[in-house]
Amino acid sequence: MVGYDAKADARSNSKLEVAVAGSVSGFVTRALISPLDVIKIRFQLQLERVCPSDPNAKYHGILQAAKQILQEEGPRAFWKGHVPAQILSIGYGAVQFLAFEELTELLYQANLYQTHQFSAHFVCGGLSAGTATLTVHPVDVLRTRLAAQGEPKIYSNLREAIRTMYRTEGPFVFYKGLTPTVIAIFPYAGLQFSCYRSLKRAYDWIMPPDGKQTGNLKNLLCGCGSGVISKTLTYPLDLFKKRLQVRGFEHARSAFGQVRSYRGLLDLAQQVLQHEGTRGFFKGLSPSLMKAALSTGFMFFWYELFCNLFHCIRREDR
């Protein structure tokens, strides 16, 4: 179960088990959804409309983008930036789930958990994700840069990217986009965790277990649903984050169409509205929703699966 449960003390996992389950969950999920993530980032950074009617648009659909990336850059392009992405996912998963379990236990001990469970999961989910974000944000910037570049590559590998970015843009380059990231991640993760719990309860109400072992399917479906809800409600801030993370990297974006510079978050929002319209705030939403559904579904699925696995191993050792 995700979150503290006083009734399941015998099944509680240790802090190490929680961290490992979160890390493995992040690792497996990232490997599976990386192609969608690359397409999503390309859509978010494209200034032209993502539709076939715009002749200047490089990408105008998920299948078309996948085909074009495959033709121009080869199959490995779908895993561009995968090494920093995996470091990001492993570290993020460990910190997020460990912090979430600890925070929900603290709220329970303060007698604030049982009567406000949706709010408790929202706040704890947001705080745990914020903590994880501050920990791994530099890796997220590296991952975005590596995934965003076309051919010829500006950075041939992770080490060169770190060295070049530090030398040409200074140490603060690794925290570009941090403000919209933190602003976006709190409600996004909060909704992930709170909606996941609510959807699981709704699932049990609609389809009572009746002794059947349907937990894994339930975790996957409810995770997918919570991912779609949370991503839809917070998507514009994710787009802002990606645009700001490649600020100062415009020369590598010239092959993808128009290039525009932004002074900050407010200037970015104004320019998107002025030049791209309200639809500009939702560029890349389709692959993002697909990615959010799969990544959140897999995240909770694998996390609960490994927590249960650790419990079974401990029980057999007794």
Swiss-Prot record:
InterPro entries: Mit_carrier (IPR002067), Mitochondrial_sb/sol_carrier (IPR018108), Mt_carrier_dom_sf (IPR023395). It comes from the Eukaryota. The keyword Transmembrane helix applies. The chain crosses the membrane at residues 19-39, 87-107, 122-142, 173-193, 220-240, 293-313. The keyword tRNA processing does not apply. It is found in: Mitochondrion membrane. Solcar repeats lie at residues 13-106, 116-202, 214-309. It is a multi-pass membrane protein. It catalyses: thiamine phosphate(out) + thiamine diphosphate(in) = thiamine phosphate(in) + thiamine diphosphate(out). One of its GO terms (cellular component) is mitochondrion. It holds the Pfam family Mito_carr. GO terms for molecular function: antiporter activity; thiamine pyrophosphate transmembrane transporter activity; thiamine transmembrane transporter activity. Keywords: Antiport, Membrane, Mitochondrion, Repeat, Transmembrane, Transmembrane helix, Transport. GO terms for biological process: thiamine diphosphate biosynthetic process; thiamine pyrophosphate transmembrane transport. Belongs to the mitochondrial carrier (TC 2.A.29) family. Mitochondrial transporter mediating uptake of thiamine diphosphate into mitochondria. It is not clear if the antiporter activity is affected by the membrane potential or by the proton electrochemical gradient. This is Mitochondrial thiamine pyrophosphate carrier. The lineage of its organism: Eukaryota, Metazoa, Chordata, Craniata, Vertebrata.
